[in-house]
Amino acid sequence: MVLLKWLVCQLVFFTAFSHAFTDYLLKKCAQSGFCHRNRVYAENIAKSHHCYYKVDAESIAHDPLENVLHATIIKTIPRLEGDDIAVQFPFSLSFLQDHSVRFTINEKERMPTNSSGLLISSQRFNETWKYAFDKKFQEEANRTSIPQFHFLKQKQTVNSFWSKISSFLSLSNSTADTFHLRNGDVSVEIFAEPFQLKVYWQNALKLIVNEQNFLNIEHHRTKQENFAHVLPEETTFNMFKDNFLYSKHDSMPLGPESVALDFSFMGSTNVYGIPEHATSLRLMDTSGGKEPYRLFNVDVFEYNIGTSQPMYGSIPFMFSSSSTSIFWVNAADTWVDIKYDTSKNKTMTHWISENGVIDVVMSLGPDIPTIIDKFTDLTGRPFLPPISSIGYHQCRWNYNDEMDVLTVDSQMDAHMIPYDFIWLDLEYTNDKKYFTWKQHSFPNPKRLLSKLKKLGRNLVVLIDPHLKKDYEISDRVINENVAVKDHNGNDYVGHCWPGNSIWIDTISKYGQKIWKSFFERFMDLPADLTNLFIWNDMNEPSIFDGPETTAPKDLIHDNYIEERSVHNIYGLSVHEATYDAIKSIYSPSDKRPFLLTRAFFAGSQRTAATWTGDNVANWDYLKISIPMVLSNNIAGMPFIGADIAGFAEDPTPELIARWYQAGLWYPFFRAHAHIDTKRREPYLFNEPLKSIVRDIIQLRYFLLPTLYTMFHKSSVTGFPIMNPMFIEHPEFAELYHIDNQFYWSNSGLLVKPVTEPGQSETEMVFPPGIFYEFASLHSFINNGTDLIEKNISAPLDKIPLFIEGGHIITMKDKYRRSSMLMKNDPYVIVIAPDTEGRAVGDLYVDDGETFGYQRGEYVETQFIFENNTLKNVRSHIPENLTGIHHNTLRNTNIEKIIIAKNNLQHNITLKDSIKVKKNGEESSLPTRSSYENDNKITILNLSLDITEDWEVIF
């Protein structure tokens, strides 16, 4: 019943919405030459059952120094007359240290093209991994002779090839054309003809590569010889031209270059990931003529909902509910088809990229968190942001001048609405020239920053990679030869906010250096002013007169790299260069940067937050924001939110209230509005809306200790902050379809925002166990072994929010104007026992703003409640605790403990005193000022330091 209701709601939602974005600007698969060709090829191969790719068994070699298996894949093109054509593709396969499997298929080095004046490399781009993988892997790669990556450290010399066995890798052949590799719990079978891989976890088949024989690599050929190089199942549609209206000038200097491969996820009919798309968390089936999912960073103002169209960011990472994942390491335009086969309990996927190489990392494990952990270990952990940046952000396009900013600042205080960041959009600049200030509006930025700093507040300004022609900054970019070039080698000029613009080439190392120098001058501030941060928008890149709202694919970057090859990592290169600049500038204070990017790729989580882009103030966009934020969270980039309460158009009061109630749970909590909308700072609202929004924002601040602990967990393991229910309860099949209700990390906080108008109640899904309504701590129990649905009251001023039994929440419950002013406040512990009377919770504390935590300057502890006793069990304290405590950690005391009550045998009652064990001594503490009601016990006036081990016996 739960699943049926969800499916009905999804059908109504996605069919009722009227599209806002102009669809005709973006290609459909049938209009994309390489997508159409590969779909046709797949359809024809499925009918003919032919296979043209095989492993040359004689080429297989295993270098014990590298622990990498090398081979050659042969593509045979049959000819009616003369000899068949054979094309060679070098293949490598190896294991990462976490037992993930990486394989690559490249094209044997191409002969230089005969085309005169070619300004790009004729070789396939094989360096996406250098942008996507974390530096620790890149550094390891650079210490070896392997051009891609050094995976295995143990070395062993043996006499016979088939006896090459190490503790990492065992290799054998069981038949003439089948080879077996094993690494811990993971094993791989390589089938030579037709080429195929089968990947096993603990001897269970989890993934089949090329099961459908969709492998297709459009090898290099000239237009004149093309006819002889086409397979019978192929079409020649748009191989050497692009007839799409908005990209018909693409010179396509290397002709067809696409790569494609199919992957079958066994034992699962649920797959997730490949953000960013405005659709359901569980990826849609795209068979039967539907559009594939597209990964291609573009500017989609008022994007369409319920479609597989591309958006601002791309993370080519997908996993199944059977805890198996693939990471398609390719930054080119990419399409992904998905087909669920419930009769065989498997999911078939088809990945198609315009060019580059096939570079895939396959991970397997016991559960989905392990898969996400492996992915973020490879691509880099999400950065630990300043605690201020997980507070509330107030933004609009635009705050007009310094007085406008300071008026917002003072009015927020006057109405007791906390906030930490205020933002300046495009109009703060002088004539839309980045790295400048509009002098009559912001005559003294240092003065403005100083005033904001008094209460610990921060300013974010917009700086985009497009630079107005003919001013100092763009002139230097041109003079230093670090502008992106057109296909003729001239500085590319396109249209964006300033009019005619050029684009900085941050793919270039020297371009990054020049970009950094601009920030060094722009952020030349007194040493004590470290509260200016940056927003990189429009970095897909967005080009108003460009094809599909973005860059022509035949633009040229440094080192003869074509835009076609690196499109989806351009935005990452921009924001990483910006992050490095800010980090360097603030290094004397050791301050952590905060940075927002609109475009992203795998690895962007290392340095930036993001948001869902230019949404609209209506209920459909509120509803879709939840699966969108969830999708990024499970794909390794958790620091994301959506513009509250819609960027474009004016929201109703009801929508504002409901959107703040949903936005409270976004990891990135920002209100933003278009320049043409009415002002909607929270203090301008009429009652009761103003009080509702104020209370929501205050609740976010009360929960900052728990939220910051979640961010720390994510920075260590990649664990989602907004967390799908199926990750916490994978045993229930129905939860794999739920994306309108979620947990906050592993805290036990379970929430379902109201996303439809006129609702005063909602249906929530609860697994077995006890749940406590957050505000009252009133409890109810699901005594069964299955999920139940329960009708929950949800008037406009109430969030459907529960604590799952077995968890402990840490809070600070005093109103302060910003997060900095909360540092000296004590903690409040909320204990929600499970049906056995137990509960556990974690707390992480550092200074919230510097990199001191990387030097061990933090406290990490776990609260354990059982047998009516609360224990504090520290897992880490700083070596120099006294100095660190005084200067950075500030107040580490627990002042109040709240224990939720229930009607079970483990329930407790308030006694005249409690016992405290600390430092080997036991004392009795009176509870005269404490109190009790039907739902909870509140114990006050405590002084329990989280940096010490102690027990409290109730």
From Swiss-Prot:
Glycans are attached at residues 114, 126, 142, 173, 345, 783, 791, 867, 880, 907, 941. Pathway: Glycan metabolism; N-glycan metabolism. PROSITE patterns: GLYCOSYL_HYDROL_F31_1. Heterodimer of a catalytic subunit alpha (ROT2) and a subunit beta (GTB1). Keywords: Endoplasmic reticulum, Glycoprotein, Glycosidase, Hydrolase, Signal. Its EC number is 3.2.1.207. One of its GO terms (biological process) is N-glycan processing. This is Glucosidase 2 subunit alpha. InterPro entries: Gal_mutarotase_sf_dom, Glyco_hydro_31_AS, Glyco_hydro_31_C, Glyco_hydro_31_N_dom, Glyco_hydro_31_TIM, Glyco_hydro_b, Glycoside_hydrolase_SF. GO terms for molecular function: alpha-glucosidase activity; carbohydrate binding; Glc2Man9GlcNAc2 oligosaccharide glucosidase activity; glucan 1,3-alpha-glucosidase activity.
